[in-house]
Amino acid sequence: MAFNYDRERHRKDGKQGRLIGQPIVLTIIWICWALFVGWLNCWLTAGIRATIDWFHSPDSYQFLNGQVNAQVFAILSNGWQTANLGNYQVMRSNPLIFAVIELIGAGVMLPLVIKTWLKWRPNHGNQYGNDRLTTEDEVLVQYPQIPDRGFEYDGVGGIPVSHIKATAPVFLKHHPVTWLRYYFAPEVSQLATRLPMLKNALPFVEPAKGFYSIDQTTVNSLIVGITRSGKGETLVMPLVDILSRGSEKCSMVVNDPKGELYQMSYETLRKRGYNVQVLNLQNTDFSMSYNPLQQIISFAKEGYYDETQQAVNTLSSSIYVDPNAKDKFWQNSSINLLNALILAVVDYAKRNDRWDEVTMDNVLHMMTELGSKQVNVNASGDIVPSAEELMADKSLKMPSDSSIAGQKNKLLVYFAQMQKLNEKHYSQFRQMALDSFAQSKFAGDETSGNIYSSAMEGIKIYQQSNIAKLTSKNSVNFESIGFPRTMRFRLPERYKFKTAVIEIDDDSGKKLEKRTQIVDKVGMLNYAIKAKLPDDFTIKIDFDYRKNEPDYRDAKLVVTGRKLYQRNGFTAHSFKRDPYTHQPLLKEVKLTIKQNELAGDVAEMKMDYSESPVALFLVTPPNNPSYNQLPAFAVDQIFNTIYSTALANGRKSFTRVHFLLDEFGNLPPISHMDTKVSIGLGQNLLFDIIVQNLEQLQINYSQQQADTIESNCANLLYILTESKKTAETISAKIGKRTVNVQTSSGKMGDVHGISFSNQFISQDIMSMNDLMKLMGGEMVVLRSVYRQDQKGHSVAAMPIFDHGQTAMPFRYTFLRHEFNDQMTLSDIGIKSPHRSLDLKALRINYDSAYNQLLELMDGG
């Protein structure tokens, strides 16, 4: 079927009717004509020679004198007799006459041959387009080849651009060793195990069904495929498998609508050493906990004021930003109001050291409990509670001036008291909250109600108790996705902005790694560890660096580290082991100061250690798209966290991270997504974006942003679409070729009146209709920056058309063991810290918080 389809597709170029225009054919015709002329030339040469001889003979004089007899024309008769046709002895006796006639006779045919060649010559595609598709041989030479299942391979993973069957002769021609190792040898071994004597002697190894050509370069990819086009079966699932089989395993952040990919791949990924996490918004009781304010909490606790404000603004902008909105007033007011509320909660947490209460649930209730109520106030702006309110809530207090001067919104009163307190006891977080509140225009009588409604619309999902619980705890460390091993030391303040030299040695003194790192503005030394550490190791930190002042260079800190494992008993090797990898489970890494020659104590030491890449699945319910706000937050925060850590640790994440964003059009706008796809590659952060058509990019992003996202995806993998605009765009990018079109005209039955004409035209290599009718497994790959083969030779990045023996296989035909579609949530032990959480126990009492503001003012 596929062969006939290809033959029908390529029949458009008209090559079948151009045999007469081939130079070899025209040369043969001309040679045949020359031979015919030579054959006839023998007779003409003999006749002409005889005629010349006759004029010089006595017979001609006798004829001219009227003496005619039978012998007068004997010479002429012998010369012009038909027996001389093909008599090449004449050529030897009369070479000059023969040559002249031969040249004239053969030359007569040349104009006709040349005219025929000009009319019927094959088109080589230079006049109106000379684009073409990449050949199978070129794909096999240009890309790394890996087995399509089972086997580990060298290097990092990459998106598959083609697949070829193991039995294809062209693959054996280019990669005989790979073919023998992954197909022939396992096939022979599998046959041998059928023999009774060898059944248990040889390991059972499944041979590869074929081989993938993968792009291991650091590029973004855009995948286009409508629903039910097979993109999950032919690309998404195989990509997860490929990324997890490389010797340098990649971390993955996968948007997984419905959660099927998470359930199917969990067991395989765990066996391959992955730390598999899931943010399950479809069933929050079987999900990790994710507090979108956790990054803000971390910055605020450590005293990073600017970073806290930036993280707050990024989060708020992610909720309310609409690049296609014409009136930005309500959008900006909502952003500033939410900024103010979050920072006010941060200020409360800092005052009371209750950081676990910095949650979106408390932010929401600050808005609902304070922003929706009007209260009586006195002339100073203090709340004057009624007698009933005093009886109902003992925490309320009557101000000294209990006369009612009017009513105000309770949220305005709260921030007014924050302003008064800040004038007496300055807090930077409090000032940030006040600045944002002032910018929100909430204090305006005419706009406050609309701003309140607009702001509530963006965070109403946190009214759902399941979402409120999930976002009130946090059980994932985003930094570990790109940097699985990190350590931090809070050093004395005098070392701020100094360059530290960090060296890590094993217990024998062998150096594992050494690098410089700057102590940041709060005195924190954050360091990402690239090497995998032994059970016992030593960390040496000194300031003997040329850019440090001399009086700092003698400072030194030596710390010993030891891995502590979870135990089942008291024997030396009674460790708890991972049920999938069978490796001991790490409990913690204990750090002990061995030598401190710093000018002060080390206030904090901590190491987060893992040797596992992370696979984080973001399960989004298709029937409740409002929940997709959280995965969008997660993608943004993961990128920002890893990006900033990478800049401080060699500019690249130690583990390559693939953001595999299926159904990208259903996700809310990810903050600065156009910038992320532009700058992320330098930090080893790759995006694989999947849409149903190119227009989907413009649903949540402006035209300019959508164009930037598309142009920064070096690979465009097209599977199928129903969008004519998308198909036309893809067709134009594939290119055009020149074809010769023949037309005929004439009346029916008039054989001699038919005329033919030829015209060169430009034709799409693959038309819009061709692209909208691709068969299952067929795929077009547009690549823009892949311009070197495996040997470093420059190549042209021609489009690839996967079809026939290079069609992409479906997952269920060869990856059933790796992706078990029978696995369900009940088979996976998911621990959810928030499952039994009491929301009320974490909720802030804002009346008490208000009274605290008053007490702090009075106490000041």
Per-segment meaning from a language model:
Residues 1-229, 233-241, 246-248, 285, ...:
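Basic- and hydrophobic-enriched, low-structure N-terminal and domain-boundary segments
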Residues 192-344:
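Switch/coupling segment of Walker-type NTPase motor domains
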Residues 249-251, 613-615, 655-658, 683-688:
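Loop/turn-to-beta-strand initiation segments
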Residues 281-469, 480-486, 490-501, 506-513, ...:
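Helical/strand "switch-coupling" subdomains that flank nucleotide/phosphate-binding cores, especially
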Residues 450, 454, 486, 490-491, ...:
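Conserved P-loop NTPase motor module
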Residues 450-484, 489-494, 592-657:
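Conserved helicase/translocase P-loop NTPase motor core
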Residues 579, 583, 677-679, 683-780:
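Conserved ATP-driven motor cores of ASCE-family P-loop NTPases powering translocation/secretion/packaging/pilus
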Residues 653-669:
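Conserved P-loop NTPase "ATPase switch" module shared by AAA+ and STAND
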